[in-house]
């Protein structure tokens, strides 16, 4: 065993005829992962259609599963994040594509969970400040050329 926690992220299965996430979750738990993130689509679906959270809930409610279960897929708003906890019982959520162009979604979710109120989207001026900060961090983290190329994708999604 290693001294740092090891987690995994997987999908429901290969395709709609092979949704085997409960078996996968048990096997991963048995080999020692500390938490499991589950994307609510199959491999063959990629990102098409809506995420299916019912199999994620079945894993969470499986009495043999003792590790934290994180749900992933279509968390695009504070309301959807809250639904993941309340309706499906997950221990946490992972947010992917919804953060591209909208990195403030985390602040919006936290505010909604704490107050029950939705924060408005950022103004264009506020979005520009976020872009500037992200560009500086990206350039610092990667390098000037690749950092700027990386940020084009995010900037195009903001407006």
Residue ranges and their predicted role:
Residues 3, 17-35, 47, 54, ...:
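Alpha/beta catalytic cores of nucleotide-metabolism and tRNA/nucleoside-modifying enzymes
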Residues 3-16, 42-43:
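Conserved anion-binding
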């Amino acid at each position: 065993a290693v001294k740092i926690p090891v987690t995994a992220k997987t999908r429901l299965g290969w395709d709609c005829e092979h949704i085997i996430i409960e078996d996968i979750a048990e096997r991963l738990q048995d080999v020692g992962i500390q938490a499991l993130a589950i994307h609510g689509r199959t491999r063959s679906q990629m990102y098409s259609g809506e995420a299916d959270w019912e199999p994620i809930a079945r894993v969470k409610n499986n009495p043999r599963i003792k590790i934290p279960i994180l749900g992933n897929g279509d968390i695009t708003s504070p309301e959807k994040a809250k639904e993941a906890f309340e309706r499906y019982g997950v221990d946490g959520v992972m947010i992917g594509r919804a953060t591209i162009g909208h990195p403030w979604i985390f602040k919006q979710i936290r505010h909604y969970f704490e107050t029950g109120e939705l924060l408005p989207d950022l103004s264009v001026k506020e979005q520009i400040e976020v872009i500037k900060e992200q560009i500086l961090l990206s350039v610092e983290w990667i390098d000037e050329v690749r950092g700027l190329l990386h940020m084009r994708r995010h900037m195009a999604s903001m407006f």
